[in-house]
């Protein structure tokens, strides 16, 4: 145990989350992030002069860096495990497959830098990451994907974070894997996959977020969680391929997702 603690004292930690603020880039399909002070310093004072401030936050659970629960997407009325969506859904949330059922992550993470594989800083907005791209990137990284891993796919898209319309991909699309790439990844049985973009998967130019086949393949057909809007730039720049991945969703009973602050740890 002593040796373990001494190793962690030297650990390097990468924060893989984007900051949350009013007006941040996000999917147009979800309630925007808003935060206001509910009580300001000086509104209420104790007899000794003490004061406190607090806020109210309103946001969709799929805004900012977040993870999808398996209740997030259905196909022809069915959720993962052939569960009828209507039978477990109410105005208060889901009685099955909610985010509270997702255990914390403490596992091996694998980074696939597809932009580097192509020799570019950022993949084009309308680029679909193919099976050949994934295979080539994995081979170049001299690693493998094991069952239960978390696989992070970098397109360099977080370099566009400050350009809201471009980052959201509404007009020009966003890079990501397509259905074929999702099927290939699912065959390796990762516990979750993530990327820098809002939707994780390829968004064709001009189509917006209307068609998301990768969500069906992962969430409905294979029970693989999706982590979106990640900040991977520093991890990519470090040159690491394998790392300890840490993530814990909020314990929101019946919710279809949760904001998260994932970490990559090098020991």
Residue map of PLM features:
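Active-/binding-site microenvironments in catalytic and ligand-binding cores
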Residues: 1-267
